[in-house]
Amino acid sequence: MNRFLIAALLAPLPVLAQPAPQPMKLFTPGADIPALIAKAKADQKSPTINSVETIANVAPYQVLLEYRTGLTPPSVHRGQAELVYVIQGSATLAVGGHLTGVQPPRPGSASESGSGIEGATPQKLTQGDYAMVPPDTAHQFQDIKGEFVIMSVHLIMPEAKN
């Protein structure tokens, strides 16, 4: 009886331990983007870390502002395409090929990262450019000089029908 009672009381704990979902955010005025960039810049801990701020959010989708000042590891987003718009700066987007030194995804993440990327096609990106990374495709932002700020949206792709 005691075991049953303890099990019943502990059963909700994994649910309680989950992070709270972000509240829906339907609009961010363009005038607020410089403040989001400043916040991302202040939050950045290292040039190899991508600082992220939410522009808009309707689960399961987030429109993110990503702030980078250096090379970050290449990645593959399993089952997700990625739409990119360059807000500020320039970089080379390497797309395709394969990851080297693959690291398994973090728990709950659809993204794998690696230590390098081989066989990718380079595409220069500058302010105002758009790019789309297909699902399950290796990619990396390279040749970042100064600040590189993008808007990105990961798009969950429907399963292919055979």
PLM feature spans:
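Extracytoplasmic
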Residues: 58-60, 78-81, 86-88, 136, ...
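Sec-dependent N-terminal signal peptides
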Residues: 4-14
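Short beta-strand segments in beta-sandwich/barrel cores
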Residues: 90-93
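Ligand-binding loop in jelly-roll beta-barrel domains
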Residues: 124-129, 136-158
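A short, N-terminal "cap"/entry segment at the start of jelly-roll beta-barrel domains
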Residues: 16-78, 161
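His/acidic/aromatic-lined binding-pocket segments of jelly-roll/cupin-type domains
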Residues: 75, 82-85, 122-123, 130-131
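Short acidic-glycine-tyrosine-enriched beta hairpin
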Residues: 98, 102-135
